[in-house]
Amino acid sequence: MGLKVTTVKVVLFGIAYKGNTRDIRNSPALTFRNILERKGIDTYVYDPLFTTTELKTMGFKPFNPNNEQCDVIVICCDHHQFKSFDFKHMKSLKFIIDGKNILPKQNIPVTGVGKNPSCKE
């Protein structure tokens, strides 16, 4: 896929510990973000339940999927908005890691945790 740690842009979709909540206590997304950033990976967050100001106040780099691009998306939370999200307009998106196994097959390679990789053929 030609991704380099020094230039890849990763977006974590959802920071809550479970879907449709704003509770981030013990959220695996927080740990994952810290690991990625320690490795030098440019990491952003998109969570429709929080405002950009709230995300910045919590120390996150907000991402707006309507007008920004990224290389990798990691689904960290199963907010209902993510289940029907249209990823097709994100032209630079290389693949999605679906940590909650909520996405249907798409034209973008999707892999879920504990499942075989899948993509529309």
Can you say where each PLM-predicted feature lies in the sequence?
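Structural/interface elements that position substrates and couple domains in central-metabolism enzymes
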Residues: M1-E121
